[in-house]
UniProtKB/Swiss-Prot annotation:
<comment type="subunit">
    <text>Monomer. Interacts with TasA (AC P54507) in pull-down experiments.</text>
</comment>
<keyword id="KW-0749">Sporulation</keyword>
<dbReference type="GO" id="GO:0005525">
    <property type="term" value="F:GTP binding"/>
</dbReference>
<feature type="domain" description="OBG-type G">
    <location>
        <begin position="159"/>
        <end position="329"/>
    </location>
</feature>
<dbReference type="InterPro" id="IPR027417">
    <property type="entry name" value="P-loop_NTPase"/>
</dbReference>
<comment type="function">
    <text>An essential GTPase which binds GTP, GDP and possibly (p)ppGpp with moderate affinity, with high nucleotide exchange rates and a fairly low GTP hydrolysis rate. Plays a role in control of the cell cycle, stress response, ribosome biogenesis and in those bacteria that undergo differentiation, in morphogenesis control.</text>
</comment>
<comment type="function">
    <text>Necessary for the transition from vegetative growth to stage 0 or stage II of sporulation, but sporulation subsequent to these stages is unaffected at 45 degrees Celsius. Required for expression of early sporulation genes, further suggesting a role in the induction of sporulation. Depletion effects on sporulation can be partially suppressed by missense mutations in spo0A. Strains depleted for obg stop growing after about 3 hours and do not induce the sigma-B factor following ethanol stress.</text>
</comment>
<dbReference type="InterPro" id="IPR036726">
    <property type="entry name" value="GTP1_OBG_dom_sf"/>
</dbReference>
<dbReference type="Pfam" id="PF09269">
    <property type="entry name" value="DUF1967"/>
</dbReference>
<feature type="domain" description="Obg">
    <location>
        <begin position="1"/>
        <end position="158"/>
    </location>
</feature>
<dbReference type="GO" id="GO:0005737">
    <property type="term" value="C:cytoplasm"/>
</dbReference>
<feature type="binding site">
    <location>
        <begin position="310"/>
        <end position="312"/>
    </location>
    <ligand>
        <name>GTP</name>
    </ligand>
</feature>
<dbReference type="InterPro" id="IPR045086">
    <property type="entry name" value="OBG_GTPase"/>
</dbReference>
<dbReference type="InterPro" id="IPR006073">
    <property type="entry name" value="GTP-bd"/>
</dbReference>
<dbReference type="InterPro" id="IPR036346">
    <property type="entry name" value="GTP-bd_prot_GTP1/OBG_C_sf"/>
</dbReference>
<feature type="binding site">
    <location>
        <begin position="165"/>
        <end position="172"/>
    </location>
    <ligand>
        <name>GTP</name>
    </ligand>
</feature>
<dbReference type="InterPro" id="IPR015349">
    <property type="entry name" value="OCT_dom"/>
</dbReference>
Length: 428
């Protein structure tokens, strides 16, 4: 089964917890704190494997969680960093954050890697908190939680040439006779439901990858006839081969077919109609095909080359393949967006996240609810089993301005404050 879009959950491994320990060893006076740091959690990494052709594996396993780092140990021994979770994906996979809709990675080359969910850093042991005022601290940090998110994987096939056209115009037959591909061929619409790739080689030794894309119909850019699933595979092609049925047996006018398909390509955006296009007048072995071709050429205003062929009798195929190879030699990788769009839409990720430290809301029952990534991360990294850690957390909250913000919201002694699933009293 060909799967080209799937939604999965990924989570980086949590960092290992730091340790509270002290050195008690003979002949070592004033040993002091000796708790080691926790190890870093594993990253979730996607790696391109050119042997894969579909996202089928993600259909059955949709949750990926890297392992956590090892906890710190006594004698200032740090926990081991966890191994990364490496997941293989086919070339042409685009990874998008399901929440923000931002593209995380566009994976096209064999061996290319991208970190999709980073593991959390390890918590610090008590030796990290030793100061002249507190030479024997009884506190440590829990490991930082790993990044977690839902992502959408979208496969856009990597082909040099894309065959487009209405259903049953002969695209699959054409691919089957010019390459070793064996697509399903039958006399009904939408026989082809998934892209088929074939390696084509011309008589002079030039080769390229051709994709037989499922048939398009009017309204495809709006999703009609599964149009979105089909059109996404045209995005990476450098040359478009537009196959038109000249027999007229379907009762449609070939020129109207041509206009309809090009309108769908232009409506899909990504400047698909600006790419080199070759018109293939197929089924020229049929009785009225020659007459229909002449009428088509009279109406045609675009400066695209027209090649009359018959995929069944193989008439005209040699000239067509030479023209496709020539077009590819003169056509570089086509940019999906122009410079202005890139300037407007590209997001630069930096180490400094401009995030709101915390938010305060109030439930109908009068409970003040705290939220925010920074505050929640601080809460999760605090070891509440130790008094010093609790006091440090309270100081950090005051430093972030949480206490003052609660007072401004009307919080008084004894009011209930909720953070995640935990509740505590506000003390002014």
């Amino acid at each position: 089964m060909f799967v080209d879009q799937v939604k999965v959950y990924v989570k980086g491994g949590d960092g290992g917890n730091g340790m509270v320990a002290f050195r008690r060893e003979k002949y070592v006076p004033k040993g002091g704190p000796a708790g080691g740091d926790g190890g870093k959690g594993g990253d979730v990494v996607f790696e391109v494997d050119e042997g894969l052709r579909t996202l089928m594996d993600f259909r059955y396993k949709k949750h990926f969680k890297a392992i956590r780092g090892e906890h710190g140990m006594s004698k200032n021994q740090h926990g081991r960093n966890a191994d990364d979770m490496v997941i293989k994906v086919p070339p042409g996979t685009v990874v998008t954050d399901d929440d923000t809709k931002q593209v995380i990675a566009d994976l096209t080359e064999h061996g290319q890697r991208a970190v999709i969910a980073r593991g959390g850093r390890g918590g610090r042991g008590n030796s990290r908190f030793a100061t002249p005022a507190n030479p024997a601290p009884q506190l440590s940090e829990n490991g930082e939680p790993g990044k977690e998110r839902y992502i959408v994987l979208e496969l856009k096939v990597l082909a040099d040439v894309g065959l487009v056209g209405f259903p049953s115009v002969g695209k699959s037959t054409l691919l089957s006779v010019v390459s070793s591909a064996k697509p399903k061929i039958a006399d009904y619409h939408f026989t082809t439901l998934v892209p088929n790739l074939g390696m084509v080689e011309t008589d002079d030794g030039r080769s390229f990858v051709m994709a037989d894309l499922p048939g398009l119909i009017e309204g495809a850019h709006q999703g009609v006839g599964l149009g979105h699933q089909f059109l996404r595979h045209i995005e990476r092609t450098r040359v478009i081969v537009h196959v038109i049925d000249m027999s007229g047996l379907e009762g449609r006018d070939p020129y109207d077919d041509y206009l309809t398909i090009n309108q769908e390509l232009s409506e899909y955006n990504l400047r698909l109609t600006e790419r080199p296009q070759i018109i293939v007048a197929n089924k020229m072995d049929m009785p009225e095909a020659a007459e229909n071709l002449e009428a088509f050429k009279e109406k045609l205003t675009d400066d695209y080359p027209v090649f009359p062929i018959s995929a069944v009798t193989r008439e005209g195929l040699r000239e067509l393949l030479f023209e496709v190879a020539n077009q590819l030699e003169n056509t570089p990788e086509f940019p999906l967006y122009d410079e202005e769009e890139l300037t407007q839409n590209r997001v630069m990720y930096t180490m400094e996240n401009e995030e709101v430290p915390f938010n305060i809301t109030r439930d109908p029952d009068g409970v003040f609810v705290l939220s925010g990534d920074s505050l929640e991360r601080l809460f999760k990294m605090t070891d509440f089993s130790r008094d010093e850690s609790v006091k440090r957390f309270a100081r950090q909250m005051r430093g972030m301005g949480v206490d003052e913000a609660l007072r401004e919201r009307g919080a008084k002694d004894g009011d209930i404050i909720r953070l995640l699933e935990f509740e505590f009293e506000f003390i002014d």
